[in-house]
Structures are given as structure tokens and as C-alpha cells.
Amino acid sequence: KFILWRNKCMNYLELIENRNSIRDFHKKKVEQSKIDELISFFNSSPKLIDVDVQILVSADDDTASRLSGVAGYRGNTFNAPAYITILSEEKDNYLINAGFMAENLVLKLEEMGLSSCFLTSDDSEMIKKVLLINSDLAVATVIAFGYGKKERDTTKLDIHSPSNVSISNKAGHIAPKIAATALAFDSDFNAPYNFDDEYSDPVIADAVYAASLSPSFLNHQNYRFVINGTHIYLFNQLDNVVPDDDNLLGLGAAMLNFYIILASKYSGIGNWRFDTSDIKADFKNPSDYTLVAALDI
């Protein structure tokens, strides 16, 4: 069961909206008390599957330089004062689970006033070597975090379709995103979900919107939701641009954001399940989209 951790007076959706991937940090060290709180929080966090997962926090002065060229997009680690390494047993869907747990942790960082940025981590053994990690578990992901510098206001682009792009202003670093309206379908891929319909569920609309704000490699957002009453079906696309590992981590992050909104509004909802062998519906999905998980509200 997913345990909500935020005070009821604080809104999960606002927290998700406020989270940005920060790439510039102050040199101020993160207090040990906050690091201890993060580790404790992660160790009690829910999982999507039964898997051994561990967290290590590196806050030494030379951590950024040791990781440079080994982790991060094109080897850039953004000189953060601290780094989280999530280690996982390798089994089916372990990267999706790692993304799910990591996004939950990133939202906790945001609540604590700490900024963060996911780093690509393609070479598990090399990362473990430079960080002196002695473990048989694989590096699932690395997160840079600390006290972020305020970034200038910028233009936010929401891509509804190639010919329909909306523009708005928002503080901080914002990369173009696929709009929520382009991520959800009603019963099958031939019918876009009508968020404006008087009978549509506003909580589901918020959940899709929250998922659309989750971190995604190069903001490709390869996931799609098919909504059929109280049943949610999650599809994923593998492409030639986004590495498979980063794709699956991003999928897990989207699943967390979607689920946490539902769990904050509804009681007794089910959990994401990966066994979809009993689902026989024709979703008319493109051949490059695969049904990955289902959720019953």
C-alpha cells in the first residue's frame, strides 16, 4: 500500500509543479540531519516489485570530480554538493521500480528545500568503482542534489501536437514538454481523452498532468495512458533516441506522479501491476507501443 507522507495541508500537485531539474548548485553543504532523513525516508518508501534496493549518499568534496565523465549527460555532473546512488537487484521491471522510488525521493527533496537533477548512469561498474561502492547490486540511477541556484524565468512550451504548441511563462529552467492532453486516450488510441467533458474525472486529469511533469530523458515522454472508466492502462514506447534504461527510469517516475495524485484523493485504490496477461482488449495502439502496467481505481 502506498503511504502518503506529506502533511494534508500541503498539495502534492503543487509540489510536482514546483519541481524542476536544477543544474547549478550553491557550494553550501547539505546538513547531515537532512541526509539522514532522506535515507530513512527512502528505506521506508513503497516499491512496485519485491526487490532489494539500497541508497547511498556521497557528500565528499571530490564526489563531483570522481563522477565527472562517468555519470551524467555527456559526463556533466553539475558540481552538486551531494549525490544519491540508488542500487538495485536486477530483475524484471527493476529500473521502472527504481524510477518510481527515485521520483518519490526527488519530491521529498523538493519539500525539504533541496534541488535535484537525475544523472544518466550507463556504466554501473565504473560508477561503483569511482565511488568505492562494494556491492553486487547494480547502479540504477544517480541523483545530484543540494541547494540550487535560482534560474532565470523562461518560456514554457506545452506540445499538444506538432501543429499545436501553447506558450506560457514560468520561473526556472523549463524544457518543452508534451502536454497532458496528448498523453491520454479514452478506451483506445483512436480517441483522445476529453479532459473538458463534464463527466470526466478531474482527479484523473490532475494525475495525467502530474505524470506529464515527471523527469524524462530529453523530455521524450514515451509513455501513454489509456483510460477506461476506473481502469488505467499504461503503454510505453521504446525508440532509437532514448536509451532503454533511461526510458524505463522515466516511466517509473511518471507512474509515481500519476499514482501519488490518485492516492492523495482516493482511498483504497489498487497498486500498479505488471502482469497484464488477463487483459484482452484491443487498444488499437501503434505497433511500437507496448502495454506495460495496469491500475484499478
Language model: regions and residue ranges:
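Acidic, surface-exposed loops and disordered segments
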Residues: 4-297
